[in-house]
Amino acid sequence: MVSTFSRKDQNYKNDDLNQPSIEGRFGKYGGQYVPETLMPALFELEDAASNAWKDKLFVEELNHLLKTYVGRETPLYEAKRLTEHYKNKQATPRIWLKREDLNHTGAHKINNALGQALLAIRMGKKRIIAETGAGQHGVATATVCARFGLKCIIYMGAEDIKRQSLNVFRMKLLGAEVKVVNSGTATLKDATSEAIRDWVSNVETTHYILGSVAGPHPFPKIVRDFHAVIGEETKKQCLESFGSLPDILLACVGGGSNAMGLFHPFVKETSVRLIGVEAAGSGVDTDKHAATITKGSVGILHGSMSLLLQDDNGQVQEAHSISAGLDYPGVGPEHSHLKDIGRAEYGSVTDQEALDALKLVSELEGIIPALETAHAFAWLDKLCPTLEKDTNIVINCSGRGDKDVNTVASSLDI
């Protein structure tokens, strides 16, 4: 397990937080590095999102669907057996789970897919494209397209299709066309590249529902804002459950959408530690990992400047994780900024550590988390021994593990 954080890094002002600049940057990260043909679509999307949040009817419709279709609000659950497991002489880490796995479709992804589908309808776009790695964003996008009668095309890497056959079937059952991407490593990065190529060619009729807080502005802000309901509910539920804000928020980070959704309402609450956990794969000292913040450097990928896994010549390197949803060589620009100014901490755990955590949580709490989520649970082994007082820790349980059972069964020899 590796951590990037030092308390000496905390040199930010609250003015640095929460909103991108007019150029779409968080600090030096973000921006719009795209073909000219996409710029009108990005401007249109930015205006549509800005106007939608000011429209009372849009907000009411979104909230109504989040409640009646998605199943929000999701519970804040006290994991008492996990708490007992990590209790030590110095402190009791009281562990709470924000149950995004209980959303319709089984993960946090539908918060953003639903919101962007409503934006697409406002813009008159009837054709939807999306990329997916673990398949959860693809399923969420296919779901909302079925709900609103929109044509849906999902790009997915051939390698991820092998790992996530259940979600591929779900997407097809929901009426989506799943396009196999064989280029590159045939994973999430390549699926995203193909989706962007499609968008360039069909920008007049098509909206791209990007699935993470990555890509060109305004996507990082739009995706974050639709997921901020996670953190907003968590803040209210913590006050109801134990009478204060949490001490620590913990979430896995690939592109970083579930983490930003949890973190965003708390970034100005400086008493709350924000911890993101990346995929160390076979180890960060090998060439098989996806620990972008831990080991990356500044570069440009998929229309945005952020931290990337790249070689000395600026060529993007392959990422590796047992978790298809974390198998990405970049990260959202806001995460890079929060790391730089010391507001958030980032660590990484290996495939094996994530598998061990998944097994532990399943046995102690009767909850099978997604492999992505298991990376956040694995960080408890590193975090809890360092605590010097009783601490309320909220983990974003970003998805359920049904999709991963074949991978887990073969890896754990069950």
Curated annotation (Swiss-Prot):
Its cofactor is pyridoxal 5'-phosphate. This is Tryptophan synthase beta chain. Gene3D superfamilies: 3.40.50.1100. InterPro entries: Trp_synth_b_CS, Trp_synth_beta, Trp_synth_beta/beta-like, TrpB-like_PALP, TrpB-like_PALP_sf. Tetramer of two alpha and two beta chains. One of its GO terms (molecular function) is tryptophan synthase activity. The modification N6-(pyridoxal phosphate)lysine is found at K109. It catalyses: (1S,2R)-1-C-(indol-3-yl)glycerol 3-phosphate + L-serine = D-glyceraldehyde 3-phosphate + L-tryptophan + H2O. Belongs to the TrpB family. It comes from Prochlorococcus marinus (strain AS9601).
